[in-house]
Amino acid sequence: MTLQKLLALSCLLLPMIASAHKFETDQRVPPVGIADRGELILDNDKFSYKSWNSAQLPGKVRIVQHIAGRTSAKEKNANLIEAIKAANLPHDKYQTTTIVNTDDAIPGSGMFVRSSLESNKKLYPWSQFIVDSNGIARKAWQLDEESSAIAVLDKDGRVQWAKDGALTQEEVQQVITLLHKLLSK
């Protein structure tokens, strides 16, 4: 193999190595605690925040979506979120947990990101929204900046599938099929 081919091959493989996340199949996500902001709570039409940590994930089958606080990141896996809405999953057994990294937002847009989350919490009160002002989860889970990562967890909080980046339509279908399988157990 010539040096030129070897260099080209290493350039192709480098992004795969660089974007490696810390999610391992059949393991819990690496522990994370978010005290600054944290979980968005809606109670009697009033919003507040409480500390959140990954030890709270077991109990329901769930999608954990970690996104940068920017529209481009939200759009990367919007097709999955639409598929989840269409799947009509039972709220007593399933929950979407969205962690928004406002540390990775366009400067000055944090207030708009939180306002958008509040609107979504009103529309989907059964969903869980976490505001990570310091990027703690992204760092602990070694996720790409300006991106969107998806992890499917079983009811014991163990990772069954994960990807950092935009899902293909085939992967979206794979995730929905996996959710139905996990919910039937």
Question: Which functions belong to the PLM regions below?
Answer:
Residues M1-L7:
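Bacterial N-terminal signal peptides that target proteins for export
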Residues E146-K185:
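Thiol-/selenol-based redox modules, centered on thioredoxin-like
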Residues H21-W52, E75-K76:
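N-terminal "domain-start" segment that seeds a small globular fold
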Residues Q95-I99, M111-D144:
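Short, internal strand/loop/helix patches
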